[in-house]
Amino acid sequence: MIKFYNRKTKSYEIEKISGEKLLNWLYNSKNINFLDIVTKKKFFSYIYGQYCDSKLSTLKIKSFVNNFNIDMNESLKSIGEFNSFNDFFTRKLKSNSRTIYGNKNILISPADSKVLAFENIDINKIIQVKGSNYSFKELLNSDKLCEQYKNGSCIIFRLCPTDYHRFHFIDSGICTKTNKINGYYYSVNPIALEKIPSLFCKNKREWSILKSNNFGDILYMEVGATCVGTIVQTYTANKEVSKGQEKGYFKFGGSTVILFFEKNKVSIDKDILMQSNLGYETKVLIGDKIGKKFCSK
C-alpha cells in the first residue's frame, strides 16, 4: 500500500498500482532470481516493448483506462484512434488540460507525478527512500559535477504507469546534449525502491544540463524502469527552449525524472518539503507551482 499527499484536498490517498500483485511477488527476496531475469536482461523489455508497439496491444487500452479512471477528455486522441498501447501511453494532451505558471520566478513541475524534494543535500548521501541512500557520483557515473551541486536541492518526480508520460522544461534556456548511461530495468515503484539499494544508480538513465534563465544550471536526469526500453528526447540540444516545452517522453512502464539545482537557486514549497521529510510523496501535475526562485533575506 502506497500513501501519498494530495495538496489540493490536503489529505492522504492510497495509490492504485498497476500490476501491484506482480510487483510484490517479484520484489520478494524468494523470487530474486526471476527478478534478475526480468530486470537485468534487455530481451524482456525488448519483447514486451514490441508487443506494446503492436496493433494487438490496443485491446488492453480500454480496460486500462477504466481500471485507473484516466480522464480521456484531456487526450488529443480518443481511445479508438490509437495505433498501439505505446501510442496511448505516450499520448499528448490538449493544450488547455494543464496550466503552466508564466511567472519567471515560479518553479513548476516538469511532469504529472508523485514528488519527493530535499534542500541542502549531501551529495554523498542522497535519499532514495527513508533508510536508503545513494551518491551523486554513483548516479552520474562521474564525479565531475559533484562540487557544482554540493548543498543544492534535489527533486524526484516518480511517474507511475497510469500517468501522462511526457516530461517538460521547467524554465526557458539552453539544454545541452543528452548523456546516456546503460543500466537495468528495475521498477521505480516504492515497493522496489525499498528493496533495491541505490536503484536509481542501477537503472538505465540519461542526463543533460538546462542552462536556465532563472534557476541556474539545472541537471535533468531521466531514469527508465521495468518495460521502459526507450527514453525518447524530443528537444534539440544547444538550442533555446521555452518554459513548459516538451523535453521528451517514456515508453511503457513507470519512470522517474530527477532534478538537481545548485545551492541558493530555488526555494521548494514548504508543504512538499514537510511531506518529503515525513516520507510521503506529494501529487503534482505538469505546470503546478512547486517552489520559487531563491531570494536571500
Swiss-Prot record:
Recorded topology in the membrane: Peripheral membrane protein
Site (Cleavage (non-hydrolytic)): G254, S255
Active site as annotated: D112, H168, S255
E.C. number: 4.1.1.65
Keywords: Cell membrane, Decarboxylase, Lipid biosynthesis, Lipid metabolism, Lyase, Membrane, Phospholipid biosynthesis, Phospholipid metabolism, Pyruvate, Zymogen
Major enzyme class: lyase
Listed GO CC annotations: plasma membrane
Pathway annotation: Phospholipid metabolism; phosphatidylethanolamine biosynthesis; phosphatidylethanolamine from CDP-diacylglycerol: step 2/2
Subunit structure comment from the entry: Heterodimer of a large membrane-associated beta subunit and a small pyruvoyl-containing alpha subunit.
NCBIfam families the record matches: PRK00723.1, PS_decarb
UniProt name for this protein: Phosphatidylserine decarboxylase proenzyme
